[in-house]
Amino acid sequence: MEALVYTFLLVGTLGIIFFAIFFREPPKITSNKK
């Protein structure tokens, strides 16, 4: 059961970070890099 909690925490943290980056910079990264 501990593994489930750790996985949930990891996914939650990654999701929050991804959301923060996505909202901070619009999806123009591919356009900017090319």
Curated annotation (Swiss-Prot):
TM stretches of this protein: 3-23
Keyword annotations from UniProtKB, A to Z: Chloroplast, Membrane, Photosynthesis, Photosystem II, Plastid, Thylakoid, Transmembrane, Transmembrane helix
Pfam families per the UniProt record, alphabetical: PsbT
Membrane topology annotation: Single-pass membrane protein
Gene Ontology BP terms: photosynthesis
Annotated GO CC locations: chloroplast thylakoid membrane; photosystem II reaction center
Keyword Nucleotide-binding: no
Compartment list: Plastid, Chloroplast thylakoid membrane
Main function: Found at the monomer-monomer interface of the photosystem II (PS II) dimer, plays a role in assembly and dimerization of PSII. PSII is a light-driven water plastoquinone oxidoreductase, using light energy to abstract electrons from H(2)O, generating a proton gradient subsequently used for ATP formation.
HAMAP family in the record: PSII_PsbT (MF_00808)
Subunit architecture: PSII is composed of 1 copy each of membrane proteins PsbA, PsbB, PsbC, PsbD, PsbE, PsbF, PsbH, PsbI, PsbJ, PsbK, PsbL, PsbM, PsbT, PsbY, PsbZ, Psb30/Ycf12, at least 3 peripheral proteins of the oxygen-evolving complex and a large number of cofactors. It forms dimeric complexes.
Family label: Belongs to the PsbT family.
Name of the featured protein: Photosystem II reaction center protein T
Source organism per UniProt: Klebsormidium bilatum
